[in-house]
Amino acid sequence: MKAIMLVAGYATRLYPLTENKAKGLLPLAGRPIIDYTFDKLEKIDCIDEAILVSNHKFYEQFVQWANGYKGRIKITVLDDKTTSNDNRLGAIGDMQYAIDQCNVDDEIMVLVSDNYFTYSLVDYYNFYRKVNADCVLGCEFDDMDYLAHNFAVATIDQDSKITSLVEKPGVATSNIGVYATYIYTKDTVKLVKKYLAEGNSKDAPGNFPSWLYHFKPVYLYKFAGECYDIGTVKVYNELTDKLSKQNN
């Protein structure tokens, strides 16, 4: 299995913190945010390589981080050659870029670098093995308005199979929100190109499984734990304070 980490965003909502530093490399309780995700990835033995897709602006920063990485997993950093939001490839465009550049012919786990979470990726991987099908990951929300405007909203059947999945619908049809961590089978990796060729949205990684479940079974792993989407300075500061207090 390969991990593909989408790190090519410009994180303008986090300015001024991210004007000159990639969001995934911002310090969180003394470590880059991305380190916490790699701690979890390292526990999945079958992941032998992580492909990071960066924009041109922050490419060298991720190369420098990768050169200092001490873990087991091989890290490949790609420059998607984009320089602003105006010419970006989009999250799903970057997925295909990684697949093409690295000739990926394997199962993939797709992640982002700006989520801090406490749940186990091993448990998620084991769920994927159990259902033997494409998977998304999510949890239940109390704030339905926040859910509907910030996440893909899913409904599932009694077997946890997706029955509907809509990216940021505006009005939530359930209380289940999906985070940007996906596992796709080897056969599904080949469908990313088909999705893009049909002219579907290149942005927001949740748009791909929203299309996919119409053709193939997609299952939802409901995690126990916390996940923070570090999308604003407010969330970043609150999480920094929380972790600093835990470490003291």
Positions of predicted regions on the chain:
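N-terminal glycine-rich phosphate-binding loop and ensuing alpha1 helix
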Residues: 1-60
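Catalytic-core segments of class I nucleotidyltransferases/pyrophosphorylases
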Residues: 125-129, 161-229, 233-248
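Conserved beta-loop-beta/alpha segment of the NTase-like Rossmann-fold superfamily
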Residues: 59-63, 67-156
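Structural beta-sheet core signal
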Residues: 5, 52, 110, 136-137, ...
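A structural signal for short hydrophobic beta-strand segments in well-ordered beta-sheet cores
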Residues: 25, 153-156, 220
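Residues at the starts of beta-strands that form the adenosine-phosphate
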Residues: 2, 48-50, 74, 107, ...
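Phosphate- and divalent-cation-binding pockets in alpha/beta enzyme and binding domains
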Residues: 13, 36, 61-62, 120, ...
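A residue-level structural signature of the nucleotidyltransferase/glycosyltransferase Rossmann-like core
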Residues: 51, 108, 116, 180-181, ...
